[in-house]
Amino acid sequence: MRTSQYLLATQKETPSDAVVISHQLMLRAGMIRKLASGLYTWLPMGLRVMRKVEAIVREEMNAAGALEVLMPSTQPAELWQESGRWEEYGPELLRFKDRHGRDFCAGPTHEEVITDLARNELSSYKQLPLNLYQIQTKFRDEIRPRFGLMRGREFIMKDAYSFHADQASLQVTYDRMHQAYCNVFTRLGLKFRPVEADNGSIGGAGSHEFHVLAESGEDDIVFSNGSDYAANIEKAEAVPRETSRPAPAEELRLVDTPDTKTIAALVEKFNLPIEKTIKTLIVHAEEPGKLIALIIRGDHELNEIKAANQPGVASPLVMASDAELRDAIGAGAGSLGPLNLPLPIIIDRSVELMSDFGIGANIDDKHYFGVNWERDLPVPTVADLRNVVAGDPSPDGKGTLEIKRGIEVGHIFQLGNKYSKAMKCEVLGENGKPVTLEMGCYGIGVSRVVAAAIEQNNDANGIIWSDTLAPFQIALVPLRYETEQVREATDKLYSELTAAGFEVLLDDRDKKTSPGIKFADMELIGIPHRIVVSDRGLAEGNLEYKSRTEAEAQALPVADVLSFLQARIRR
């Protein structure tokens, strides 16, 4: 491809509304253009990259035995009402009526549509297992679209759905899809980690997220330095570093603590180690009008997913208001504790192992110090309530935990029968009786992968694409292309490279565009390999080669360029 025949839409300045680096570079490299909030047009340069992601995803899905379909992006309300999600789904579901007054939505996901298809097409266990996938536009009406393609309203997604007669069959396909996802991200040249994840409201027996590692990632992912254990922060089990509770060394005492409403103030005023403090958090119970106390150590953070999964706790988690606290306990949030607390109590595992600690006295401006379990109050219900921190023991007993930032680009679920049961998706089983199908769900954010790859691979000059993802593998930059010698050598090499199957962008812009601008544009776009053709080089029988990841260029004999690139470029 020649730049004279291409839409080369690079920009020198960074748009003011672009915050994250992927958004900035995709705009500057001429990959996308904003249409409206959360809506983007893919320009030729960007679309070439996305099509490469799609191709690899498609190849791995086909290799895993999945069959491609294409479902409508517009979905009738009746299916969502049947599954119960029409009422459950929030304002992210864009709803509208057609000219006949019938309700529809713009599909953010396709569980209902695929389940309807399966119940109409499948009748016998002999047709199972079946795994169907599509690559389709999705729409979620995000309240605050931001970060370009990282959190837009319209996006491209690969979603697959599998159907099974039993859990054992689902597990086989789930494992196969897990491997297929690992294959996809490996082939894309990305540093990634699959991590255990919480199923949340979807339910089911298993769930994994796939994260591209990047400092700009929105998610914390946890992994062991001594094993393959990995999970997201919501799912990771917090194992206490302590193995036993020290014996009491202090007497229980009631202390006046005026103007001490926070853990930080308590630590500073009374020289109390933060590890000897607790946070008492009061939340709504499942039973209307009731409250439950959740207690974690002062230096730990409550994991709201774990907390909401506790028996009796309302989900999603709702914190009690100050009025509710005063009505139920008689004190404000900064003075609460488990001693004489008239509520059910759940404490974190690390709290159970504390001794001689400080707590609120359930009286404003008063705390108890020197508190000890069993001596001063009974040990209540114990559960895993907190987020892990770096250095915690790995739950599998091998090594300690490290935490990195990641961008979620894929998620696989074992759905169980959540949708098939609600929508009566059944087949006749081997015994001739109806069987409700088990389902799996497997998603990859195709357009999000493009942005995540840039977040992981960039420098001060622009994007750094892998050979697999780059819009073009080679930038061919002639200096003084208008001269006969340079033009003939450039055109000859261009023909040889394209005939060899390479994707080449020949920068044939005229002499008004300086070499510096040409080089800067190619680096901004992120083309992995650059060949420069010049009078001086040709006079010496050489061309100049530079890798996008290397600082220095090198001279190559003209006759060796093709073989050099064939050996170097991963295809």
Curated annotation (Swiss-Prot):
Its EC number is 6.1.1.15. InterPro entries: aa-tRNA-synt_IIb (IPR002314), aa-tRNA-synth_II (IPR006195), aa-tRNA-synth_II/BPL/LPL (IPR045864), Anticodon-bd (IPR004154), Anticodon-bd_dom_sf (IPR036621), Pro-tRNA-ligase_IIa (IPR002316), Pro-tRNA-synth_IIa_bac-type (IPR004500), Pro-tRNA-Synthase_IIa_type1 (IPR023717). Keywords: Aminoacyl-tRNA synthetase, ATP-binding, Cytoplasm, Ligase, Nucleotide-binding, Protein biosynthesis. The keyword Mitochondrion does not apply. GO terms for biological process: prolyl-tRNA aminoacylation. It catalyses: tRNA(Pro) + L-proline + ATP = L-prolyl-tRNA(Pro) + AMP + diphosphate. SUPFAM superfamilies: Class II aaRS ABD-related (SSF52954), Class II aaRS and biotin synthetases (SSF55681), YbaK/ProRS associated domain (SSF55826). GO terms for cellular component: cytosol. PANTHER family: MITOCHONDRIAL RIBOSOME PROTEIN L39/PROLYL-TRNA LIGASE FAMILY MEMBER, PROLINE--TRNA LIGASE. Homodimer. This is Proline--tRNA ligase. It comes from Pseudomonas fluorescens (strain ATCC BAA-477 / NRRL B-23932 / Pf-5). The lineage of its organism: Bacteria, Pseudomonadati, Pseudomonadota, Gammaproteobacteria, Pseudomonadales.
